[in-house]
C-alpha cells in the first residue's frame, strides 16, 4: 500500500534546541525521525516509510537493522527496514510489536512484471488480513503453518503510482514477533498454487497500521 509521493525529512524538532547543551544529540535524533513518506538507506539497510498522513505516526531508524515506529489513531502507514532489491533470502527479525487494532507485522515487498504486492504475515492485530481473500492452500515453514491467499487491488497506490495489481499472502496461524522467515518456501508455494511471480523490487520487515494505535521496535537481519 505504498505510494512515495512526499519525500520530506522531519526536522521541525531541531528548531529551538541548537543553542541548548547537548544540542548535537537533538539534531541527530531529528535527522533519524520521520513523520512523512520517505525511502532511503540507513546503516547498510534499505528503509521505507509511507503514510497517508492520517493521525500521528513517527518512524525512527536505529543502529544496524533496527527501527522503531509509534502510531496513534493513524490512517494507513507501512514502515520498515530490509533490502532493495529483495531476493529469496532467509530473513531474521526480533523485538517487540503491538497494535491495539488493525495492524500487521510481515515480511513485505513488491515485484514488477507483473506488479505484485506481497505479505508474509507473522502477526496481526484485531483484523484478520485474510478476510474476503481467496484461499489457495497452506505452506509449512519455519515451525509454523501459513495459509496462502490472493486478493486484487483496483486503482490503488503502488510503487508504480495508482494501479490495479494482485496481492499474495502467507498468513501464519500462530502469531509471533521474532523468528526466521525462509522466504523461498513461500515463493515456491505461491508458484505451486498458480501465482505468477515477477522481478524483485524492495523487501522489508514491515509494520503496517490502519486506523489503529501501537508501537514496534524491531531488528532485522
Curated annotation (Swiss-Prot):
Gene3D superfamilies, per database record: 2.60.120.180
Residues forming the catalytic site: 117, 208
Known EC number: 3.2.1.8
Pathway terms, separated by semicolons: Glycan degradation; xylan degradation
Protein name, per record: Probable endo-1,4-beta-xylanase B
Organism for this UniProt entry: Neosartorya fischeri (strain ATCC 1020 / DSM 3700 / CBS 544.65 / FGSC A1164 / JCM 1740 / NRRL 181 / WB 181)
Gene Ontology BP annotations: xylan catabolic process
Alphabetical UniProt keywords: Carbohydrate metabolism, Glycosidase, Hydrolase, Polysaccharide degradation, Secreted, Signal, Xylan degradation
Primary localization: secreted
Amino acid at each position: 500500500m505504498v505510494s512515495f509521493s512526499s519525500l520530506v525529512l522531519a526536522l521541525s524538532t531541531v528548531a529551538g534546541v541548537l543553542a541548548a547543551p547537548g544540542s548535537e544529540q537533538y539534531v541527530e535524533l531529528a535527522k533519524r525521525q520521520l513523520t512523512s513518506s520517505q525511502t532511503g538507506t540507513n546503516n547498510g539497510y534499505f528503509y521505507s516509510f509511507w503514510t497517508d498522513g492520517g493521525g500521528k505516526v513517527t518512524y525512527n531508524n536505529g543502529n544496524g537493522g533496527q527501527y522503531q515506529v509509534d502510531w496513534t489513531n493513524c490512517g494507513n502507514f507501512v514502515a520498515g527496514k530490509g533490502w532493495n532489491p529483495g531476493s529469496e533470502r532467509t530473513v531474521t527479525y526480533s523485538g517487540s510489536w503491538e497494535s491495539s487494532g488493525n495492524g500487521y507485522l510481515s515480511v513485505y515487498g513488491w515485484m514488477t512484471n507483473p506488479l505484485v504486492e506481497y505479505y508474509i504475515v507473522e502477526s496481526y492485530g484485531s483484523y484478520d488480513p485474510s478476510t474476503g481473500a481467496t484461499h489457495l492452500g497452506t505452506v509449512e515453514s519455519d515451525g509454523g503453518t501459513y495459509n496462502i491467499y490472493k486478493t486484487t487491488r483496483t486503482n490503488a497506490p503502488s510503487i508504480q503510482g495508482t494501479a490495479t495489481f494482485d496481492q499474495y499472502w502467507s498468513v501464519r496461524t500462530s502469531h509471533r514477533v521474532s523468528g526466521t522467515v525462509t522466504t523461498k518456501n513461500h515463493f515456491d508455494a505461491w508458484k505451486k498454487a498458480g501465482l505468477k511471480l515477477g522481478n524483485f523490487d524492495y523487501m522489508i520487515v514491515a509494520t503496517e497500521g490502519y486506523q489503529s494505535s501501537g508501537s514496534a521496535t524491531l531488528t532485522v537481519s
